[in-house]
Amino acid sequence: MARVKTGVVRRRRHKKVLKLARGFFSARHKHFRKAKEQLERSLVYAYRDRRQKKRDFRRLWIVRINAACRLNDLSYSRFMNGLKKANIELDRKILADLAMNDAKAFAALAKQAKDALK
């Protein structure tokens, strides 16, 4: 049987890795070995940060809701408890958007939450 060299397969594999490594710094987008190592790390970072993003946004929404609650003389926890008792089911994303863009509507929600706590 004739010996088969890896020329075509290797070139295809290298091209695939180097294409994915576009935009990396210095040798990490030029040299196959460095690009491959960095690509593995970048995929790990991407996987990790897709999960981290959800936690980060939830924290941001809570900070925004808390700031708006303080303007309405409520703490975040009492506000959320009041909403739950008033059977108002709005998620934190919507509440944070209301807090940022519609202060009157948020104030009305805060008033309902206060009334439910009494």
UniProtKB/Swiss-Prot annotation:
Q: Name one GO cellular component term.
A: ribonucleoprotein complex
CDD domains according to UniProt: Ribosomal_L20
State one Pfam family annotation.
Answer: Ribosomal_L20
Looking up Gene3D superfamilies in the UniProt record yields:
6.10.160.10, Ribosomal protein L20
Task: Spell out the InterPro entries in the cross-references.
Answer: Ribosomal_bL20, RIBOSOMAL_L20_CS, Ribosomal_protein_bL20_C
Q: Name one GO biological process term.
A: translation
What's an example of a GO molecular-function annotation for this chain?
structural constituent of ribosome
User: Which UniProt keywords are given for this protein, alphabetically ordered?
Assistant: Ribonucleoprotein, Ribosomal protein, RNA-binding, rRNA-binding
Role according to the record:
Binds directly to 23S ribosomal RNA and is necessary for the in vitro assembly process of the 50S ribosomal subunit. It is not involved in the protein synthesizing functions of that subunit.
Tell me its family: Belongs to the bacterial ribosomal protein bL20 family.
The identity of this protein, by name, is Large ribosomal subunit protein bL20
